[in-house]
Amino acid sequence: NVDYRAPRLLSAERLAGAADEVATMQGTSRARRVCELMLEGSASPMETVPGLMLTLPVDFGGYGLEKPQLNHSIDVLAYRGSLSDWDAVTPDFLWAAHGVVLEYDSVKFHATRGTTQLERDAVRANTLTALGYRTFRATVQTLGTLPGLALLARQLAHALGTELEPTTPLQDLRRRKLYLQLMPKVRNLTGGNSILINTL
């Protein structure tokens, strides 16, 4: 078993600082670029995968969406007892300035935590919706095909008030390649549940 809630060892800021300290060495500019593209706060690999696909630049194979905050706590204490049972809720992906949330429904996580976790997730989603957040859901099936992921990206782009950048054939090829590199791990991350990887 893996505990994805373990404290992180290094932040993007600290890694960028280390690269700045050895600025004359080979590879530091690439390290700084990686820091700019990193998503911090992921609670599992299957949050990282859609996060990268959705936010990496189109030239890198992503959809180029604005980076969200991952697992960022929202204070809802003022609504406790009326719209919420909690002091805070923590969505998987949060675009706070746009009031948009994306929740990843993990088969493995829910299988190990049972219906209680499903109920908590439903209450959290309802709380966020009641507070005016536009709440989107992603499942293993949603992410299991590139067309499914593309639809989710278009829906999120619309909610964020933007349009996806048109792609060239080369960028489409890079997107399929990135998807295939990230998604083969999905069988291990879903508790052995096999899903179809379809890039058509």
Regions found by a protein language model. Give the residues of each.
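Surface segments flanking catalytic/ligand-binding clefts of nucleic-acid enzymes
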Residues: V2-L200
